[in-house]
């Protein structure tokens, strides 16, 4: 099962962090960025898009991709660092809610 959660505080803030964990993480990130060239264990500067309509969610974001088992959860893990406005946070969470199970804080710890 793939999960996601807002790992930082709720906006508004300078930056918000969303984590995704599970076997489909890379594929989800490729859909969000419209890129197959996501480098592992490096900071990827990218744009995040809504895969349903192609609208830009965040034009200047960071993506960190950690393949399992060498990640915090032991599974494939991505950390999405986005602008911390409520509009950007809500847009990304809305897209992810259509694709993934929403985790609570304990889900990542249990993994």
How should each PLM-predicted stretch be described?
Residues 101-111:
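Single conserved hydrophobic/aromatic residue that forms the stacking wall/gate
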Residues 1-103:
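A glycine-rich (often HGG/GG-containing) alpha/beta subdomain
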